[in-house]
Amino acid sequence: NEELIALMGSENAKLKISSKPPTVVMLVGLQGAGKTTNGAKLAGLMKKQGKRPLLVACDVYRPAAIKQLEVVGGQLGIPVFQMGQSDPVDIAKAGVAHAKKEGFDMVFLDTAGRLHVDEALMEELSAIKAAVEPDEILLVVDAMTGQDAVNAASAFDQQLDIDGVMLTKLDGDARGGAALSVKAVTGKPIKFVG
C-alpha cells in the first residue's frame, strides 16, 4: 500500500482555482471515456463546495452530447451554455464570456472526443486551449481500456500539456494498472476518480 502511495504521489491533487474568476476547466479525452457525465459530476462537487459552476457544451459532433449535458446539468441544478452546432472554439469563448458576465466562478468545457486520437481533434482542442487559456486541462480516461488509456494519455499530454487526469470506470480488478501507467507516462496527478 505504501508503495502504491509513493507511485501515485502522496500529495492530494486539487483543481487550480483562478485568482480572477471564472476558473476554466477544460475536459478532454476519447469518445466514451465519460467526459460529459463526469464533468457534470465534478461541477456538482464544486457547487457543493459553494462554487457557481457553468457547463459549456463544446461537443458539436456527437448527436446527443448537448442534450446529455443539459439532462445531467439539470439533475444537478447546474446551467448549461450551448450554441448548437456552432464552432467549438467560438462556443468556448462565448461560454467563458457569458460566465464572466453572469457571475459564474467556474466553467467546465465539455469538449468533443473521438474514437481514436486524430489530428483534427488535437487541432481543435489546441485552438480551444489557445482561445480561452484554461486554468486546468483534465484528461478523462476510461480505466477499462487499459493500454489504450495509456496511449491516449500520452498523446493528449504531448499535445495539450494536461494538468491532471480523471479516471472513470475504476470498478474492476485489473483497473488499477491503468491508473499507475497513466501517471507514469504523463507524470501528471490523478485528480479525480469517477
Model-derived regions, located:
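Primarily NTPase-proximal linker/entry elements flanking Walker-type ATP/GTP-binding cores
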Residues: 1-58, 65-85, 91-111, 124
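Conserved residues at beta->alpha junctions
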Residues: 29, 57-60, 112, 140-143, ...
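Short beta->alpha junction loops
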Residues: 83-87, 140-143
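Conserved phosphate-handling catalytic cores of large alpha/beta enzymes
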Residues: 93-96, 104, 116, 123-130, ...
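Short, small-residue-enriched loops and turns at beta-alpha junctions
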Residues: 33, 61-63, 88-89, 113-117, ...
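Flexible, active-site-adjacent loop/turn segments at secondary-structure boundaries
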Residues: 13-15, 58, 113, 119-120, ...
